[in-house]
Amino acid sequence: MIVKNTEFIKSATRPAHYPEGHLPEIAFAGRSNVGKSSLVNVLVNRKNLVRTSSTPGRTQLINFFQVNDDFMLVDLPGYGYAKVPLAVKKEWRPMMETYLSKRRNLRGVVLILDIRRTPTEEDLQMLTWLRAFSVPPVIVITKCDKVSKNERARQSAIIMEKMHLKKEELNYFSALSREGKDAVWARIDALLEPTAAETPGIPEEPAPPGPVND
């Protein structure tokens, strides 16, 4: 996809505040400091469209951005930051469950994992939700420039085991080298293809009349 324009639309915490309209949505999820902001900024060719919070995990908002006139990019709040107050942590679960299970515009979720970190229970919970709600995941492994090839292979094996993933499901990404940018876009573009229900059908021509029996 060629990104010509990306603009912030609004923030929301509940369905009543979600943007109206029928644009498909691709959401981005991951724990705090996983590189979500860098991934989004590289994909849309912007430096500060999504900013890294100075207090990770404190902002529990779902942020909606419109990309061209094609789709909504949805930035989900980060999770897993140890210093987040308990009350904030309790808000995160119902907010995520509601969006993932009820949002009809949602086409898929880019689930972001750090190549240097072992997946957490929150990561597994997110993937479990996506599978339970039939939301297609795109698994993106970030910060790949920070490890050697051997370490990448070792960590990939751990991620696949912990998350019950296959090798072909992993998409490697580096904000520094831009490795994986095109591959991630290809996955997103595939999810944005119109579904059968959204594609106007071509009326069938009436069948030619059969032979008439006297």
Swiss-Prot record:
Statement: the UniProt record of this protein carries the keyword Magnesium: yes
Positions of region (Disordered): 195-214
GO annotation (BP), single: division septum assembly
Pro residues compositional bias, start-end: 203-214
PROSITE patterns, A to Z: G_ENGB
CDD domains xref list: YihA_EngB
Gene Ontology cellular-component terms listed: cytosol
Domain EngB-type G: 22-194
Alphabetical keyword list: Cell cycle, Cell division, GTP-binding, Magnesium, Metal-binding, Nucleotide-binding, Septation
Annotated disulfide bonds: none
Essential cofactor(s): Mg(2+)
Binding locations of GTP: 30-37, 57-61, 75-78, 142-145, 173-175
Pfam families with a match to the protein in the record: MMR_HSR1
GO molecular function: GTP binding; metal ion binding
HAMAP family: GTPase_EngB (MF_00321)
Function: Necessary for normal cell division and for the maintenance of normal septation.
Family, as annotated: Belongs to the TRAFAC class TrmE-Era-EngA-EngB-Septin-like GTPase superfamily. EngB GTPase family.
Protein name: Probable GTP-binding protein EngB
Organism, scientific name: Geobacter sp. (strain M21)
Gene from which the chain derives: engB
